Amino acid sequence: MFDLDGTLVDTMGGFADIAAEVMAARHGVEWAWARGKYVETSGLPFCKQLEVVFPAHAANKAASDEFEARKLAVCDATSMDALTIEGLEALRGLGLKLVVSSNTGQTVVDAFVAREGFAFDLALGFDPAQGLGKGRPHVERALAVFGVSREELLFVGDSLKDADLADECGVRFIGRLGTFRDEDFRRRDPAAVFVPHVSELPALLERMMGADS
């Protein structure tokens, strides 16, 4: 299972800039401070990030709506790079099912998959009406669709919150460096496993599967 933004596509820098502009304008905080808070709480839907940073603030709903509208331009302009696609194809060659698990709205995730043309086995986004969201709802859906156990699932994400969600769901986690550094993941868990890029996952997983056999 792959997180989308910051893991499969390099959108986090653009998202962080937009989030900082929105919070600076609507909450009256410094741009640099707001950007740092966005990155720090990444891995949650932006509406929930705002509740962490500004609990029960009257501006949160409008700020969330503005961010979600403005981030679409970044989504539309950003594609998976060639190395990411190469890595995904190699993972499929190992017989693995490939799932997108994102807090971005389901319609945006569907548009991403259609635009990229890569045949993910399952693409899940944030859809409250369907009870879908990154974490337990997505894990339960994947378990049901593929008929596998939690021990057979692996979540790959770029944020510390992604690692928290994986732990809460009882699935293994591999960090994708970029949004956070190796020392950030190690500070959270000294035994953390991470890769600089998705393209390095196939070799790592081959070694892991060999060790498990």
Regions found by a protein language model. Name each.
Residues 72-100, 106-114, 133-136:
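Short, acidic loop-to-helix structural element flanking the phosphoryl-transfer center
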